[in-house]
């Protein structure tokens, strides 16, 4: 009798966990949160911005070009989502400051930062990379996420904490031939995530990392632009398809939600089964 009662309690508890994890008991897990997403007018960034807004957040999108910002905002607002936007070149201090100020002015604070902006200005041997290319790659891909995080921390502290997600790449674990400085910069983000997580945990700010594999975007176009090349890439994946931007979005929303409140300093790989160990 006692065992039967215990089994009943366990079954009900498991059912509650299952329902919660499937979203059956709670809607809008990011309700009233304010999210900044850099490089979010196309590809992975756009999919993340859309998902955060669908899950209840007020989202501020950004990009280097006003035309792209306007188009993304119009599309997402047309879907009934709470989205605004501003131009932001993450390598420029004044643009980073404006992005933060825009969110605070419109929504009263910041709860979430998704640092997605990146460049890959070079293809070839590491021995042929110029100092100029190194500076540009590390400035945008590594230094800017660190400084962007620094800029939002005071606003997150005012709201009792927050969540940062830094977008790295499968190239951090398995370097892509020819993408030499890009590979190095994306590996550096794994260390940045760990370091920020340790430093910001006492402030109730969690920092995690997303490492997408081969996702079908304009950024990765040269890897899949013809059918033969695409089929060849699929053969290297355990899940025999290329990823879509939406494959990354739900994971980021989860990491920004209370469901991930005990997760920090971690990297989640969305790579179709691509080996991902340093």
Curated annotation (Swiss-Prot):
Keywords: Acetylation, NADP, Oxidoreductase, Peroxisome, Phosphoprotein. It is found in: Peroxisome. GO terms for cellular component: peroxisomal membrane. Belongs to the short-chain dehydrogenases/reductases (SDR) family. This is Dehydrogenase/reductase SDR family member 4. The keyword Acetylation applies. NADP(+) binds at residues 36-60, 186. Homotetramer. NCBIfam families: PRK07231.1. The modification Phosphoserine is found at residue 220. GO terms for biological process: alcohol metabolic process; ketone metabolic process; positive regulation of reactive oxygen species metabolic process; retinal metabolic process; steroid metabolic process. NADPH-dependent oxidoreductase which catalyzes the reduction of a variety of compounds bearing carbonyl groups including ketosteroids, alpha-dicarbonyl compounds, aldehydes, aromatic ketones and quinones. Reduces 3-ketosteroids and benzil into 3beta-hydroxysteroids and R-benzoin, respectively, in contrast to the stereoselectivity of non-primate DHRS4s which produce 3alpha-hydroxysteroids and S-benzoin. Diplays low activity toward all-trans-retinal and no activity toward 9-cis-retinal as compared to non-primate mammals. PROSITE patterns: ADH_SHORT (PS00061). InterPro entries: NAD(P)-bd_dom_sf, Sc_DH/Rdtase_CS, SDR_fam. It comes from Pongo abelii (Sumatran orangutan). The C-terminus peroxisomal targeting signal tripeptide is important for peroxisomal import. Once in the peroxisome, it is involved in intersubunit interactions. Three specific residues, Ser-176, Phe-179 and Thr-195 are conserved between primates whereas the respective residues are phenylalanine, leucine, and asparagine in the other mammal enzymes. The two residues at positions 176 and 179 are molecular determinants responsible for the stereoselective reduction of 3-ketosteroids and benzil. The presence of an asparagine at position 195 is important for the maintenance of the quaternary structure and stability at cold temperature. SUPFAM superfamilies: NAD(P)-binding Rossmann-fold domains. It comes from the Eukaryota. The modification N6-succinyllysine is found at residues 92, 216, 227, 234. The record marks 176, 179 as: Responsible for the stereoselective reduction of 3-ketosteroids into 3beta-hydroxysteroids and benzil into R-benzoin. GO terms for molecular function: 3-beta-hydroxy-5-beta-steroid dehydrogenase (NADP+) activity; 3-beta-hydroxysteroid 3-dehydrogenase (NADP+) activity; carbonyl reductase (NADPH) activity; identical protein binding; oxidoreductase activity, acting on NAD(P)H, quinone or similar compound as acceptor. It is an enzyme of class 1 (oxidoreductase). The gene is DHRS4.
């Amino acid at each position: 009798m006692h065992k039967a009662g215990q089994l009943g309690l366990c079954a009900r508890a498991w059912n509650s966990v299952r329902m919660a994890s499937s979203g059956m008991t709670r809607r809008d897990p990011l309700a009233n949160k304010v999210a900044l997403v850099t490089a979010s007018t196309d590809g992975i960034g756009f999919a993340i911005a859309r998902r955060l807004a669908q899950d209840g957040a007020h989202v501020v999108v950004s990009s280097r070009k006003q035309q792209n910002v306007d188009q993304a905002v119009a599309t997402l607002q047309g879907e009934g989502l709470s989205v605004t936007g501003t131009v932001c070149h993450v390598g420029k201090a004044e643009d980073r400051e404006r992005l933060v100020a825009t969110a605070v002015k419109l929504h009263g604070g910041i709860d979430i930062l998704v640092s997605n902006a990146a460049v890959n200005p070079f293809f070839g041997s590491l021995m042929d990379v110029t100092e100029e290319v190194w500076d540009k790659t590390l400035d945008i891909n590594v230094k800017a996420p660190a400084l962007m995080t620094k800029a939002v921390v005071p606003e997150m502290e005012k709201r009792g904490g927050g969540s940062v997600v830094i977008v790295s790449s499968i190239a951090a674990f398995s370097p892509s031939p020819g993408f030499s400085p890009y590979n190095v910069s994306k590996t550096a983000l794994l260390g940045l995530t760990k370091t920020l997580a340790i430093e910001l945990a006492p402030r109730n700010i969690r920092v995690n990392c997303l490492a997408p594999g081969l996702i079908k975007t304009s950024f990765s176009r040269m890897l899949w632009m013809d059918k033969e090349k695409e089929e060849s890439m699929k053969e290297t994946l355990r899940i025999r398809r290329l990823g879509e931007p939406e494959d990354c979005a739900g994971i980021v929303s989860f990491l920004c939600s209370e469901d991930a409140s005990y997760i920090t300093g971690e990297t989640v790989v969305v790579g179709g089964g691509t080996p991902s160990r340093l």
